[in-house]
Amino acid sequence: MTVSSSVTAPPDGRMMHARLMNGDRLTQAEAAAFMHEVMEGNVSGVRLAAALAALRVRGETPEEIAGFAQAMRASAVRVQVAPREVLLDVVGTGGDGAHTFNISTTTAFVVAAAGVPVAKHGNRAASSRAGSADVLEALGVNLDAPPQLVADGVNELGIGFMFARNYHPALRHAAPVRADLAARTVFNILGPLANPAGASHLVVGVYRPELTRMLAEVLRLLGAKGATVVYGSGLDEFTVCGPNTVTGLRNGELICRTMHPEECGVSLHPKEAIVGGSPAENAEITRALLTGGGTPAQRDIVALNAGAALRTAEQVESIAQGVARAREVMASGAGWDLLQRYAAHTQRAAS
């Protein structure tokens, strides 16, 4: 007697390329299977370029992006932090071309000093002069600290930084194609979705307003407990230069709104007031802000982003409350003390 199995075979990633070229939409599982083949180096450069171009023309679905991110997470070097209710990442897609100072990096240390565990995932500069990795390196952080030391940073100090290049080695198979295309592809938005420590709560900045709802839906599909996705009038983070397009994920529901800085107790400022410079110059701005200094515009934009992060992590009842808490932390110098302790912690690997 033949016994039929009710177990469905996993999708064959090798067949998904043809589906994409036909204009078909993939399920999350199918997209994950295709990206797994990419991560394994089993998709030729020509086929990958064609698939990325087809996706760009047709437009990716939330399920496809979630599947791609799922495969990236599976292939990443893991950072095993102790179980906790909240583990936050504050990250942007980049690509806004605004050349601001390192707002999300500074924000991460303010939020961690306020008591929220942070596992920040970041890279060197792509479209700016100084990425999060560049400025943290300038501040004495060892970017090549091993995963266990980064996990210990989260567990013992409340913060860890994961240099993306070290945690996603499988992306090397896609790197030549991405460089040759010289255009935005789905890979530009996957990095913030593939935190190697498995952040439960995320603040994600994006470079187009229509991506706010899209990525919030992706994060819901990926099981995030809470998230805020923002486009800040040309910035891939909350801005103090105009309105913010925001989609929040809370209790499994998406809430879309336009948020003005004045609602949260911060003033409007011109974009020129938040421009940064070289890694050394941005490191000095971060140091000033974490020790209670900086300009009013710099303080306001970090306080706003930190306030939103504290709200996302469910530590305050409103962004305005979070802004007030962030101002207290910056004035106290606790964020700078934390950064110095974390830098010393990472240097243990080099000694």
From Swiss-Prot:
Subunit composition and interactions: Homodimer.
NCBIfam families: trpD
Full protein name: Anthranilate phosphoribosyltransferase
Residues involved in Mg(2+) 1 binding: 104, 237
Keyword Amino-acid biosynthesis found: yes
Species, as recorded: Deinococcus geothermalis (strain DSM 11300 / CIP 105573 / AG-3a)
Function, in words: Catalyzes the transfer of the phosphoribosyl group of 5-phosphorylribose-1-pyrophosphate (PRPP) to anthranilate to yield N-(5'-phosphoribosyl)-anthranilate (PRA).
Binding site for anthranilate 2: 178
Cofactor info, note text: Binds 2 magnesium ions per monomer.
Pathway(s) per entry: Amino-acid biosynthesis; L-tryptophan biosynthesis; L-tryptophan from chorismate: step 2/5
GO molecular function, one term: magnesium ion binding
The keyword Chaperone is annotated on this UniProt entry: no
GO cellular component term of the entry, any: cytosol
Binding site for 5-phospho-alpha-D-ribose 1-diphosphate: 92, 95-96, 100, 102-105, 120-128, 132
Requisite cofactors: Mg(2+)
Residues that bind Mg(2+) 2: 236-237
Binding site for anthranilate 1: 92, 123
Alphabetically ordered keywords of this record: Amino-acid biosynthesis, Aromatic amino acid biosynthesis, Glycosyltransferase, Magnesium, Metal-binding, Transferase, Tryptophan biosynthesis
